[in-house]
Amino acid sequence: MAKKSLIQREKKRQNLEKKYKILRNSLKKKITETSSLDEKWEFQKKLQSLPRNSAPTRLHRRCFLTGRPKANYRDFGLSRHLLREMAHACLLPGVTKSSW
């Protein structure tokens, strides 16, 4: 189980990313569309003034039950440990153990 503070930090980053997503995308679009170098510098400064944690690259996918940061499956939102346990317990519909 991950520390509660790390899980809360990740939730804070997700909220910041949602809050600044539209503004960040519009600034990036303006940077690519303008031809004037001075305007590009101005938009770039505005983009850099946004909070660092509002960038989507700062987000990290975590298991939503345990908060484990590594070995997560996107389709389920679970870590590999919980995916295996829940699949064996038939708690994930449509997931079967393969055998060949």
From Swiss-Prot:
Disulfide bonds: none annotated. Its main location: plastid. Keywords: Chloroplast, Plastid, Ribonucleoprotein, Ribosomal protein, RNA-binding, rRNA-binding. One of its GO terms (cellular component) is chloroplast. One of its GO terms (biological process) is translation. It comes from the Eukaryota. Pfam families: Ribosomal_S14. GO terms for molecular function: rRNA binding; structural constituent of ribosome. It is found in: Plastid, Chloroplast. InterPro entries: Ribosomal_uS14, Ribosomal_uS14_bac/plastid, Ribosomal_uS14_CS. Transmembrane segments: none annotated. Part of the 30S ribosomal subunit. Binds 16S rRNA, required for the assembly of 30S particles. Belongs to the universal ribosomal protein uS14 family. This is Small ribosomal subunit protein uS14c. It comes from Marchantia polymorpha.
